[in-house]
Amino acid sequence: MDTRNVIAAISLSAAVIILYSLFFQPDPATIKKNLAEQNKIENNEDTPSLDKNENFSKLSRADALKENDRIQFENGSVVGSISLKGAAIDDLTFKEYNIELNRNEKITLLSPRNVEDGYLIESGFVSTNKNIDIPDASTVWEVSGNNKLTNNNPVKLTWSNTQGITFEKHISLDDQFLFTVKEKIINSSDKSYNFYSYGQIIRNELPEISGFYILHEGFLSVLDDELIEEDYDDIQDKKFTQIAQDGFVAISDKFWVTSVIPPKGKEFKTTFDYKNKFRANYISTKGIEVKANSSIEEKIQIIVAAKRVNVIDGYAENLNINKFDLAIDWGFMYFITKPLFFVLDYFFKLLGNYGLAIIAVTICIRLAFFPLANFSFKSMGKMKLLAPEMARLKELHKDDKMKLQQAMMALYKKEKVNPMSGCLPILVQIPVFFALYKVLFVTIEMRHMPFYGWIHDLSDRDPTSLFNVFGLIPWDPPSFLLIGAWPIIMGITMWIQQKLNPTPPDPIQAKIFMFFPVFLTVILAPFPAGLVIYWSFNNIFTMIQQYIVQRKMTIKTT
């Protein structure tokens, strides 16, 4: 990559982002209208509240799991249990994912509500009728029949109040991450009652988050085709509420998602809030009347999943969950990022290694931009051939910058050379570069995937460091000194590439460009190793192409 073109292209990209934010922000009238609608929804007294006074003494996770009777569940992807007290899904571990690369300890996502970092899902009914007993977090349910939940064996929970009403939960589990809960009310009394169905995700504490601006971690919903993303700190300041008829409610981590999907075609109110714990929930806005000696049933779906692309896309399609694929944060360049993942995944299946797949994608990108790059290199080759004449003009007009600039422009016009022509191929490639960064950062498929040699995780930084001679000295340098072998390889290839480009006439500019490979080496050191490998091989392929083009031009001129 021509360093000057990289700087120019990045500047142009920044300008586009700034202009977009200036001209496409919602107007104040729209914001005011949305706030008015928000207040109207929040002050709606027709829908019962999910606020409850719950006081639980905090226990260790092990003790909390022993405190109440539980139904165990297991399939090929998850293992855990459902507490009979409250009937919440509050214990779930992913069987296929380790916490760290070389440790066998598995990722545990859900924990009981009386654990410090409790994280759980609950569902059921509430009512505006204060005289009726309804199951809550303290209710102890009874198991009817099978007492272990698997993908082949559903379970049934029941609880009856003293007013002649029985509540049932029929829970099933597929072979991956989907729980289906059929909530049933059987009214054996001589009175009619109204109930509102709900689903709720509760998280006691702020989790450890990545903190990168390119990744959303927090509250997530698609409501009537609108994507809603709210950060934890925003919800701590002000709750979010919106009414919709279609969508899902979720809390999203980098690689995991916990979501509840309301019944189809029924209006519901979604709320994100914080009252000593984070809550994401929905509640139906219209009561369901259960007449005397009758019954009703509502079905909700709960997905607690690792964000594997084929799994998330499969649920989105098979369950008809609108835009559920956005549970993976593909970003605003969705139209590039997601297809790029599929290309990478294709080469992975073909070559058996994501590092090799990245190199294959690099070659494909070079081939796709070959005509643009050729045009750029020919222009730079002409610039290099004009270097002696440019040096002569510089010496001739060294005391008059205006005349020097005019002479240079006349030379460019005469020789039909555009010094900025190299910008276009670089500018086109910048979205691809950021899209690849996004893919490496957010897709669980890249997690703990090795390359050859010392790279054991392409989604993480190069673990080696120049400052301990790549592990030869028994010293662990601080993170800001972790400049690994691949970032250095990238810097060297960029420096060699610079030598193929014409030297800038301005000595200060020349020094800046000479320092740029060192600067970029330091900047890219903490980036995912896969991205640095991409940039390194892109430099190598660019140098080869540039050398061939310039050699042909030299032969033609001699």
From Swiss-Prot:
Keyword Transmembrane: yes
Species assigned in the record: Pelagibacter ubique (strain HTCC1062)
Top-rank taxon: Bacteria
Keywords, ordered alphabetically: Cell inner membrane, Cell membrane, Chaperone, Membrane, Protein transport, Transmembrane, Transmembrane helix, Transport
One GO molecular-function entry: membrane insertase activity
Compartment(s) where it occurs, according to its Swiss-Prot or TrEMBL record: Cell inner membrane
Designated name of the protein: Membrane protein insertase YidC
InterPro entries the UniProt entry points to: Membr_insert_YidC, Membr_insert_YidC_N, YidC/ALB3/OXA1/COX18, YidC/Oxa/ALB_C, YidC_ALB_C, YidC_periplasmic_sf
GO terms of biological process kind: protein insertion into membrane; protein transport
Function: Required for the insertion and/or proper folding and/or complex formation of integral membrane proteins into the membrane. Involved in integration of membrane proteins that insert both dependently and independently of the Sec translocase complex, as well as at least some lipoproteins. Aids folding of multispanning membrane proteins.
GO cellular component: plasma membrane
Membrane-spanning residues: 6-26, 326-348, 355-377, 424-444, 469-489, 512-532
Primary localisation category: membrane
Topology of the protein relative to the lipid bilayer: Multi-pass membrane protein
UniProt cross-references to Gene3D superfamilies, sorted A to Z: 2.70.98.90
HAMAP family linked: YidC_type1 (MF_01810)
CDD domains, per database record: 5TM_YidC_Alb3 (cd20070), EcYidC-like_peri (cd19961)
Gene from which this protein is expressed: yidC
NCBIfam families: PRK01318.1-4, yidC_nterm, yidC_oxa1_cterm
